[in-house]
């Protein structure tokens, strides 16, 4: 059988006799074995080789070598040594052969292994020992690995070895697969080898196509499975272990093994072509040897293979499969690059056997451990192994030295001589923690060099490392516990060689791409290119220190997956846990075998065009890069020529990884990142945080401040992101011009992906920016032992690297600057975010890093802002979805992926200023952008309106009303109204006009009417509707027109729908407004219920409104339920449209809609209450998106409904009624920039209209005035027009009916912040100032305000009166127009001088008009609006004026009587409003004036007063003086107060109906204009009384009218009224300290000086107070006037003789005086007339001595 046919990669194996190939081989793990090995001084360093197919003649080629390498391996069994040493061993030639007997007992096997009865495969290890001789460059000599199985596998039903008689050899099955077609053939060489036997005690635990993993059972402990390896050459997929064999002399003489004890370099093997096979202990890890691109054999070249197979503790080898396993390409590459291969034909044949069989791209990783005592290793436990590819430690010595295989590439530590102390040339070769189980690998980016040059550099680098190494002692530790690193469950399935393409990586890739709709062109085919040499020679290995070799960091071995994985280490671990990012294997030939990014050395993302072949080498130098102002680390780049293959691999290599990762991130970047982290954590197991002491340490980062490089696609070339501290950002990164400078790179290299925040804006988003993250670094002292490459480098701050590329291939330099960076890991192509955002702290000087990363939502790392097309609020969206939103698409909040803000009712996340500040956008820039966006979006919005406006109205047809809140009523037989009609004898219909039920609007119930079936009064029940059809009625939407003639009064149809209660109605109304409902379907059913025909109804819902209707609505009682029927008001012809007046059945507070009825008496709006309506629909009915304008007080534009309208300024003329031309013919003056939809535009001087200040949240509206130009120019000065604060420019010059008195008009317009909504004209839309009404004085023109949302209850109506104005109905002219003249901005009565009089006149006329039939409909509605305006009035002066205002002549009703009469009004709304006003403002004792004659009557004295106000402000009916005719400084006498002249308050007098007062003089001081508090000085009681009576100082405007003004709010002051008689209703009893009073009362919450519950506890002093003389008492009172515990007493009504009181101690306190008249009737039991302290026995007056009331205070004291 030919070797080629059996897939043997090495033809030399055919010359070996299988009978002498092997002997019994077993591994003894007990202590005696290693003690003997140590006693011999044997220590074997690592051995590795790349397997390259060789010709058969290579074995026969013999050249005399300098030395011969002999191997001795002892095998112990049951404590006895069965090893045999060759007697011919010498110092130079040591020949060791392990001969085993034919039985298991002769093999050296431990007891534990024998009990386990496990079988282990035999292995042949090929060693290539090359030596440099006298500076000659060696040529790679290729050796091969022959995989065989021992014959003992037959016992486990393994495939039997087949002997080929023709060749005299033995063919052994590969991998134990049981398939005999592919096997390894070994020629017989009986003269060179001894007998081959196997043992039964060792069996394979796992044999897979990727390799084998096995387990040693020692003491019941199972070692870890090491990762299996794939043979890239395809020669064999399995690794087997051979027990023992002897070395032939021909091989030993061929100088294949240069294992001298004195030399540490490789032999020169230029003239040597030979293969050798050496048997090693199973504790050695067998590495598959792969060739590099040029065919050179370099054992250190592991950049393309990093598959791990760890057999602890002797061996640590880490390897990751390279994914570029296109064997056809590899075969071609090997043939071209192989040097000295005289029989490449056989190599091709050998490789062709496995064409189509790629290595498994998702190879599982295994590790194996063997419990070996620490003492046998003789090494320190804490010393980390830093070799990143493989470090093998053998307890055997070759003479006095060892073998060293240098590795100049990728900072991979070479194999070195290991002395007795476990040191490699002065460096500790042992490892601690998990690093001993898994060695760090070299970066996958590094490229192998030519064999000649790499050996030169390899030798020099190795020597330098030997000199610079530091020494460390290792603490003793239980190696058994240390080596337990892997906690993963390994697979135990046996994999055979694939016989079909199914399951192959290429096939899997194709299926995967096809399932994701990704084009697939097959695996790439390209010509191999020779890598370029390392120009820096050995400088790249400078970064090791502290005895650690660079690259010792532990790698995160990803299991299987198809996405970018992040392994994030949390917590503190002494600065030794850098960020670890693992790129998992992806099916296909696009990723490198080294799919692991080494933490602390390389940060790689799958953004490269060809991730596997693109190898850029990063070397730290001292002179490559210097920044001007920022001292940063000098970095240079070396780029391999293979990086030029990007163009070929864009579609397959990098693209596949990006597609795989991007598809996952597209779904949910946040969840995917968490998922990736979790998978990585599961792959690596639970890791300890202590890198030095724990066996499960995550990473031992020995690379100080190592460089992080990143590959990305051709567009960005090979940008460089400095150090692991920099969290990478690659796409859509905002960089400020003043912070970042781009590298010298053409714009096509990706500079367009870095937009500037101040210039580049997406049409729909505020910015394509990111939320700025900060990288924070901890600073520490410089390490004295740091590497020389870091000398002079200052501690780095947060670094942000701009990407760039030089024109040359290498070196490629990226500019590093010290700036804040964004913590987002992005894919270079699709901008997906890996959702890693956090802060990184780093000890830069030591190169040790601690990564504290927090996983956040993707929108926090990189986000943009987009405005909702419905609510116009700005929402945050991921920047990756910005590209999907263009100008033609419509975006609403429901499309937001962030569910927190996926509803228009949700408030904006941030204010506009904060958004602009976050994005670095200035206000002017934002305004300009909004204006530009408005212009761009106008056409799109109008187009979308036309498209959706054609949609038909959808509703559910029902026949009767549906009650949602209750069940339908049904009448009993006793409740049914039965008419007295009799059936007609001639068969005519009964129940005509004379029917009693018909007269009462009650339908006769079927079955109860005497007329029976001939009853005509059952129209609702029988649904006797007329015939009509639905049609499109222009701007009014759908309408209903007749298909037959109709007589007057005929029943047309019932208006049916859903019956809602008031609460449900309000909710439904807001819901419709929120959704943009534009049609009006509400109808009042009764006082508590409303019909909504919007969602459900019949054809009656399509009847439109008209201010001159031809139908009317009537309410009928049908079986106990009220039904609304529509009846004709006149004779109607066929084809005539049916209309009725919506206002008759208007729901109070319903939304107002623009009326398009076109009648001569059109009121302009339908059904809306302008005082407190929520929304006014401004758009036409045929527009699909109603123009909703929020009318509320919320200045931020986020009102109750959360819906605004975006109005633009070009179509005002189109949507204006024809009356626009009638406004004095000034249509041509409307400027283009101030036109507004549905508004009358008037051009004002340019200087008065500054540019609009627009915010992104508010609606973009530039509003104009709709007033008469003549009136503006004639009556309002230009300088005063700019001071107007009215939301509509109508208030700029609000004109009186006669159009005169410009001063009055200007004052009203500028000082009262009146917002007027003209009902006969289209409503003016403008903005409301953000300041209060008082601050608005002197403001700028309102149309240019920032706030663009109109509060509805702030908008009032003002008719535009001019000779050219259209005619309005009398009811509008008399009521609505005049009412609007009287109202202010908040809907209350304005403060103008004539407002009170006009309001009372309007109220009187409206109340009087309710008796007429024509105006009765409007009177009830108008009365409710008048009273509602009164409730909204907040000005005290206005309310007082209205209350005090009398009729124009005697006998006219007063306001009080009018309001009291309205409490018994028939209309429910008027009744409730009047009662509400009465209960709030009119006390009960004023409702019945005759009751105030009774002083102690409980109805009047203990009436419930509004608890918001101080009880002391309650009017007093006893001993109160009327308001004097003129104020006086001092009054010597006072008029006696009478109950008839009792006033509502001290400041004014309310005349009784029986005694009207004709004096209409107003007070000097107004309630809303409090006078200044007079300076506290010595005053008389009369002067205080005068001030109290006339001044009413310190009046609080929030107090109601009709009550006395409060005193100045002084903390310790109390209010008291001295009275001659005790009044039980007074709040404070005499003599009680304030602290005690507070215990019996409840002070007001808003005002501590007021009482919520006034104390009323009577004072009964017991025992009586001690006596005191009058003079002494008052002397002390005068001195302590301000410090008395009672506080200051305020006297308001009682006029007493002058008594000077000095109040100099506390000027803020009111004067405190004493009066003996208080409490004279307090003690009713004793009828005392003097205060208790005056009732003394030693005084001149006794307790029973009365004090006349007409005596002054001095006379009382001196009597």
Swiss-Prot record:
Renumbered residue ranges of the record's region Disordered: 154-181, 197-237, 437-482, 515-556, 738-816, 1225-1253, 1271-1345, 1496-1606, 1727-1759
Localization of this protein: Nucleus; Chromosome, Centromere
Catalysed transformations (reactions): N(6)-methyl-L-lysyl(36)-[histone H3] + S-adenosyl-L-methionine = N(6),N(6)-dimethyl-L-lysyl(36)-[histone H3] + S-adenosyl-L-homocysteine + H(+); N(6),N(6)-dimethyl-L-lysyl(36)-[histone H3] + S-adenosyl-L-methionine = N(6),N(6),N(6)-trimethyl-L-lysyl(36)-[histone H3] + S-adenosyl-L-homocysteine + H(+)
Keyword set, alphabetical order: Centromere, Chromatin regulator, Chromosome, Metal-binding, Methyltransferase, Nucleus, S-adenosyl-L-methionine, Transferase, Zinc, Zinc-finger
Coiled coil: none
First-listed, main subcellular location of the protein, grouped into a coarse class: nucleus
Entry EC no(s): 2.1.1.-
Biased composition (Basic and acidic residues): 154-165, 197-206, 215-224, 776-797, 804-816, 1304-1316, 1511-1521, 1566-1577
Pfam families xref list: AWS (PF17907), SET (PF00856), zf-CW (PF07496)
Effect of residue 908 to A: Loss of histone tail binding
Annotated Low complexity bias: 1284-1293
GO terms, molecular function: histone H3K4 methyltransferase activity; SUMO binding; zinc ion binding
Record's compositionally biased regions (Basic residues): 462-472, 758-775, 1317-1326
Tissues/organs with expression: Ubiquitous, with higher levels in young tissues, including shoot and root apex. Expressed in ovules, tapetum layer and microspores.
Assembly with partners or alone: Interacts with FRI and SUF4, two components of the transcription activator complex FRI-C, and with SWC6, a component of the SWR1 chromatin-remodeling complex. Interacts with BZR2/BES1 and IWS1.
UniProt-recorded name of the protein: Histone-lysine N-methyltransferase ASHH2
